[in-house]
Amino acid sequence: MVLRFPKFSQSLAQDPTTRRIWFGIATAHDFESHNEITEERLYQNIFASHFGQLAIIFLWTSGNLFHVAWEGNFESWVQDPLHVRPIAHAIWDPHFGQPAVETFTRGGAVDPVNIAYSGVYQWWYTIGLRTKEDLYTGALFLFLISAISLIAGWLHLQPKWKPNIAWFKNAESRLNHHLAGLFGVSSLAWTGHLVHVAIPASRGEYVRWNNLLDQLPHPQGLGPLFTGQWNLYAQNPDSSSHCFGTSQGAGTAILTFLGGFHPETQSLWLTDIAHHHLAITLLFFVAGHMYRTNFGIGHSLKNLLDAHIPPGGRLGRGHQGLYDTLNNSLHFQLGLALASLGVFTSLVAQHMYSLPSYAFIAQDFTTQAALYAHHQYIAGFIMTGAFAHGAIFFIRDYNPEQNKDNVLARILDHKQAIISHLSWVSLFLGFHTLGLYIHNDVMLAFGTPEKQILIEPIFAQWIQSAHGKTSYGFDVLLSSTNGPAVNAGQHLWLPEWLKAVNDTSNSLFLTIGPGDFLVHHAIALGLHTTTLILVKGALDARGSTLMPDKKEFGYSFPCDGPGRGGTCDISAWDAFYLAVFWMLNTIGWVTFYWHWKHLTLWQDNVSQFNESSTYLMGWLRDYLWLNSSQLINGYNPFGMNSLSVWAWMFLFGHLVWATGFMFLISWRGYWQELIETLVWAHERTPLANLIHWRDKPVALSIVQARFVGLAHFSVGYIFTYAAFLIASTSGKFG
């Protein structure tokens, strides 16, 4: 018998319906459920696939470099970063005739092109790249790394090169390798690149392999390092009149602690960034030598965790049993990794605009907006994935005997208190925030705006003041004129920091008022409700009062039949599915807030946000409607403009989003009846009935159809907002 797809599941391969195809795709990456899988093969397959993932990433970044070098305008952009528009790549087949060709021929190009809103130009410029040849060299290097990664992936699937299970479960060696070997060494390498290539380039010196050993990054070379006079590396930094990319106003320091921003580029000082990476290097080198491996020195993680028993007895057996639970569960490890990465990605979004590290990126408003929204959406998907794998851990990997009375078991014991508290917080935030907004709307509608309830965020303002913002008049900590912290930091980073914090033209510590207070609590509502759904899904994954035997049904099940009412929509997968809608809504509010606040800042019109953000109609009218008006009129009978493609994407995104509801509202029976009618028509239509199918067409399962609906909702939602964000920002600022 010829083996049919999927080869990993014999029962599915013999399924006579189209379920074979769709369910085969759905479970292709659920290695644990495949026939003939062993724990060792599972680890080996995942390990090898990591190299494939790296190959894809390196090929993608190589492609970015190659296309900008080939079709971009990097060299002319370098000459005038604030006025030349960076080109991402050419448009080979501009549709819609001559008007389209003229519209999209920009950035000094002779043919239609796309403008780059990714920030790669600013990144490459900051790290010392200056010519097309630099970009081609980088593209070739990354292409080779991609090929090597592919070979490494293939190699680690060969019998001789497959690591054994003990190698994968050696937690201490893995920690040391990742901390010191990956994070530590790569941070040191990056410090080296900044010191030897990027900082000299910012001072007008072009350093490459052919002159690397001739051009000393610091006049005194390695002398201060070996004589212990490290402070010499911080002396004579770039002056405030430094012209980036030239020797005008340049200093000689390579590792500084200046604080604040370079006046011309509005980005962090490169010498501060190099210092930061060197400090991280040292931290990770220390961390990478803390765990016991070959020489019997350092911590044993198992002993460390087993010793964590709080003496008061209020946490039972503390962390006992956690080592084996964690080390033997890939889902637990993945859940922790995703939770960490999700938080980190959101922090990246927050820091990229408030403390920009790339030269001139702060003045490229569309790029700033695009990068913020991009990283926040990615963070949302990663965070929901963390809870999904946490739930799968509880269903597939959790052993109650192994974890008796430890912190994990006690979380399960207290789940009803945890879930009900999250519910209470969500209800409180929702009713009060919506109540305030609606009250304010009614007051505006009745022509009495002075009767709005406007609450100043005094605690947040106090925190900003403690960090040095003086406009609120709190006179506390760093905003105090004569405190110990102020006096201690006067000769270090403080003067530049205080200048940056109190500069109204950047995004560091924006001035906040009643509108910010309200939207902050709306976002808090979204975050807490998303968390409630995710936490409930994970903690109830093994069973609940309603369905104590839930774990026997697995991660995703639609219902337990008609004889057991109330068991629909309560699988852990359903919780993940519901949470994604809340996650998308929450990040919608986050990005609306960020974007509107910044649009008014960039247009020097902050009073619009301050006055209109305190009621819902203000958001709908002065943010959404006002900024989408160009999109709604993006193409018309009189021709087209550079926003037309975004206008089309805005429309198309809405259509994809709306298609999602078709799958979310109509269930399996409707589609099965429709399919059977189409089959009847097919069999009776001449010519068409010459084609026969091997798999009997059947409707998707309830869970699969929900996933299709969710995918359309998510993709359409993001497409719609991406088009709105880029068009409304670039339409105003170019």
From Swiss-Prot:
InterPro entries per the UniProt record, alphabetical: PSI_PsaA/B, PSI_PsaA/B_CS, PSI_PsaA/B_sf, PSI_PsaB
Membrane-spanning intervals of the chain: 46-69, 135-158, 175-199, 273-291, 330-353, 369-395, 417-439, 517-535, 575-596, 643-665, 707-727
Family to which the UniProt record says this protein belongs: Belongs to the PsaA/PsaB family.
Localisation per UniProt entry: Plastid membrane
Coiled coil spans: none
Protein name according to UniProt: Photosystem I P700 chlorophyll a apoprotein A2
Binding site for phylloquinone: W671
GO MF assignments: 4 iron, 4 sulfur cluster binding; chlorophyll binding; electron transfer activity; magnesium ion binding; oxidoreductase activity
Gene name of the encoded protein: psaB
HAMAP family: PSI_PsaB
Catalytic reaction(s) noted: reduced [plastocyanin] + hnu + oxidized [2Fe-2S]-[ferredoxin] = oxidized [plastocyanin] + reduced [2Fe-2S]-[ferredoxin]
Binding residues annotated for [4Fe-4S] cluster, in chain numbering: C559, C568
Any GO BP annotation: photosynthesis
GO CC annotation: chloroplast thylakoid membrane; photosystem I
Membrane topology: Multi-pass membrane protein
Keywords assigned: 4Fe-4S, Chlorophyll, Chromophore, Electron transport, Iron, Iron-sulfur, Magnesium, Membrane, Metal-binding, Oxidoreductase, Photosynthesis, Photosystem I, Plastid, Transmembrane, Transmembrane helix, Transport
Oligomer and partners: The PsaA/B heterodimer binds the P700 chlorophyll special pair and subsequent electron acceptors. PSI consists of a core antenna complex that captures photons, and an electron transfer chain that converts photonic excitation into a charge separation. The eukaryotic PSI reaction center is composed of at least 11 subunits.
Binding-site residues for chlorophyll a B3, renumbered to this chain: M662, Y670
PANTHER family linked to this entry: OUTER MEMBRANE PROTEIN, OMPA-RELATED, PHOTOSYSTEM I P700 CHLOROPHYLL A APOPROTEIN A1-RELATED
Predominant location category: plastid
